[in-house]
Amino acid sequence: MAFYDREIKRVCESCPRLLILMINSVFSKHHSEDAEIIFLDKEQNIDSGENTTYMDMFLEIESCRYHIEYQLLEGNMAIRMVEYGMKETIRGLRQNGDITRVSDGRYEIEIIMPLQAVVFLAGANKEDTITVNLHLPDGKMVTYDLPCLSASETVSELSRKKMYLLIPFQQVQLYSRMLKAKHYTERTKLKLAEALYHFKLDAKKELDNLHENGILNANEVELLVTSLHNIEDNLLNNDDLIREKVTEMGDEDYIALSDRLIQQGIEQGIKQGIK
């Protein structure tokens, strides 16, 4: 399951402009599309549980800090979000020296939590937010909401929300079913093969449309299509028959511009190598 951890981080780091667009959309920010992104913590935190993988991403854009969790399956992330957010905040304070300061004879500590969000890659979380109620020792309670995003939405909906980075991951909603694929009948396997094929087809059509309308550049499309194929290949590792059927379907019905861009890049690289 660490595959999805590596893949989402690869895509985010390779397409910084698209990551900024998603963050601007989720948090109603207005960061410049070419702003520098500082990845503060690239360590992987993977839960030891059998069915869940958690993926941390701490970053800073124009002095604003963000914490994004990419979760493979559905689950309650509230406790982990508070834990990770607080842990990273305290770690940053300690790196900058003493975490306390004296003001009018009183010791104070200022804790600024990063803006946080959860992205569900396979599970379709039914709520738009996770509410956190933090009860303090003095009886006060602080309530705040964490935005929840789902890669299982339609590609057009992901585009509307400017979550272009998640388009290749839409097919991950078949993750749980693909894990059990070897136990399915041939008829069910054929349906899964068709579902995977149509996820790929719809994604490529959407990416082509975004490129033709000047929303995505050629390099971004190429990176997202590469991710699309990487994820499909990983899902197909669970059953040879489904892989065979998806391969047979091919792309004959639709020659995607995104595939041509990849081929053009290869050919251009060969030409440059010859020179």
Give the positions of each predicted feature:
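Conserved single-residue anchors adjacent to enzymatic active/cofactor-binding motifs
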Residues: 1-239
